[in-house]
């Protein structure tokens, strides 16, 4: 169902051998900008897209905001009637939080040497060391792409930061389990 093989060092490794890195991005309130600023942002985004020689995926995640911790704090500090007013308002209003992500792909190229390596008998430790070296080289290529995207989108006023392993796991977990707001995520190592 989900093509994720593993997540290592903030890198999503797919079952087909591809890699994905995820940047979390700040937002820009485009509607509050002047016409000149909007034009500059639009041109900056167009220039950013034109510099890419690989595809990216822009993901916007909208979730209903859980205000229960805030309401609990209000109950401690404010009179009961004000807390009830806020509670009824939050029940009626659909207060949302939005998160913005850019997913950056990298697909390693299979070299001729590695494609015939299955013909040779090598020890498990040699194969493991070679696989780790290959992973680090491929991850370095993905990190270059992540840096290119973060710097490119930065020209529009958007800050982008790569997610670490735990943040990627949480993002995937929350994406595939949208109804579970308060349950902690179990990381089985």
Question: Model-found features: residue ranges?
Answer:
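N-terminal pre-first-transmembrane
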Residues: 46-64
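An amphipathic, basic-hydrophobic helix/alpha-beta surface used to engage anionic
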Residues: 21-23, 33-49
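An aromatic-glycine-centered, glycine-rich loop/turn in mixed alpha/beta architecture
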Residues: 1-3, 88-189
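Structural flexibility/helix-modulation signal
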Residues: 64-92
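Ordered, soluble secondary-structure elements with a strong preference for glycine-centered loop motifs
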Residues: 31-39, 53, 136-143
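Active-site-flanking beta-strand signature of metal-NTP-handling nucleotidyl enzymes
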Residues: 19-28, 100-106
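N-terminal basic/disordered segments at the start of proteins
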Residues: 1-16
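Short hinge/gating elements
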Residues: 25-31, 132-135
């Amino acid at each position: 169902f989900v093509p994720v093989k593993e997540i290592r060092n903030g890198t999503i490794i797919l079952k087909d051998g591809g890699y994905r890195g995820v940047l979390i991005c700040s937002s820009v309130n485009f509607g509050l900008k002047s016409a000149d600023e909007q034009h500059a942002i639009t041109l900056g985004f167009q220039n950013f897209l034109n510099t890419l020689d690989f595809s990216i995926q822009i993901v916007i995640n909208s979730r209903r905001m859980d205000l229960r911790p805030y309401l609990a704090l209000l109950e401690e500090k404010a009179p009961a009637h004000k807390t009830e007013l806020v509670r009824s308002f939050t029940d009626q209003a659909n207060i949302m939080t939005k998160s913005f992500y850019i997913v950056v792909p990298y697909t390693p190229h299979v070299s001729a040497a590695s494609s015939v390596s299955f013909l040779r008998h090598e020890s498990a430790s040699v194969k493991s060391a070679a696989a780790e070296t290959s992973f680090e080289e491929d991850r370095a290529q993905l990190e270059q792409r992540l840096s290119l995207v973060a710097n490119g989108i930065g020209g529009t006023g958007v800050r982008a930061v790569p997610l670490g392993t735990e943040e990627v796991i949480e993002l995937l977990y929350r994406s595939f389990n949208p109804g579970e707001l308060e349950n902690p995520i179990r990381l089985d190592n």
